[in-house]
Amino acid sequence: MFRMSRSVYVFGARCVILFALFPLLSWPAWGENRLLALQKDVPLHPAVTAFFSNDDEFISEVVIPSMERERKDEIHLKIVSSDGAPLQTCQVSAELQKLEFHFGHCNLATEKSSRNRHLLSSLFHFTCPENLTKWKNYAPDLGVYDFSKIDSMVDYCDANEINIEWHFLSGYHPEWFTSLQTDAEKAASQLANSRAVLNRYQDSVNFFQVFNEDWHTHIERAKVFCDQTELFKTLRKEFPKVELGVCDCWSFNKENRLPSVEEVMSRYPGINFVSMHAHKPRRLWASPKEMFDTFEQYKDSDIKIHVTEFGIIKGEIEGVYRTGDWDDATLAEYFVQVAATAFSHPSVRVLNLWANYDKFTGNRLFGEDGKPTELYEALNSLLNHKLTTHVTGETDENGACVFSGFHGRYKLKVKSSSGRLFTAQFDVGRKATHAKLVINEVEGTAHVTID
């Protein structure tokens, strides 16, 4: 599509220092009381080590610095008493519980095996279901809905803090849809279904794909029978607070690149996100630069990119970046690369894996014996051992401390000078990096406020 010099991407890389495990004490740096970073005593998977020590300069000079710059911040903590007095020399520990970035799986909330669902939930906290929210699966007749299975999924996701993307409002068409005589009737039915779903789930589902596979690709069962721009404008006006997007079979190769920001905004006024399948060509090993080139045009826009159907079919590797065959080792390497590279780009908000068992033979996270595959172990190493933050130390004379950490939800443990242990959770993001923990020793309570 276009070529960019490396200078477009390269900015000053943040120096990240990982300390070994020390006793609880403060570390003086830059005039601030810095907490010490703790390393997990677990060796990284070879695929993770291979990516972060790769001799591809684009990874070392662009991807990794972008990850440090875009997904981390200096997080400032202050510990005070209920009357506002700073609490000095409190022992402090903060550990990342969940990344702000949405790593997901299509079967996270629908997996039938309780064991496998537990294993999935230790990696992911987002789902774009493969089939459950398609129109044909909850509308047995015109104007008749059976949302019982979706309600159960939504309840499960709410209880387990799993975010949901609806796939998708305008299709696939139910069987009875073909009996409608005119395009006008079909258009009215698609609008009515969109309204029914949004009215029911606008407060419990995070993202809604309005259309899928009827722009870049044209699938008959996904065909939209009304003016797409007008339908989108109608839903945007009626549901102003809902996150609306579109989905299609866009990918990382030049033939399937995302449309321009200008095209998307003109076609879908008020759009919040675009969801790309990223599974064609079926055996493509895209380079990190090809991935960045796909994402980069959205960098300065408010439209986020969701990679919602990522998958590989085994066979001979396609593309020029790597050659050979897809096997356990190469799949582990590529999925780590895709996850880390998507995570590093500020335009991307979601990476959702597709089709665990069927067509996408390269996506299997569990073997025939039910045990986690090499791919699962590699993703577990990346998400739970590499992209994590765990720090410890003490507050200074101002009750303050600071650390560098990934954006997400943290569990904070504070032991006051009285020896009492207090725990709390708080969320850190780009615009929320200052947290104050207020401790009430008398009542034994603690709560966090974010500035």
Predicted regions and their residues:
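Beta-strand-rich domain onsets/edges
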Residues: N33-N107, W135-Y138, C226, L244-G245, ...
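Conserved, mostly hydrophobic/aromatic
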Residues: L77, T127, C157, F208, ...
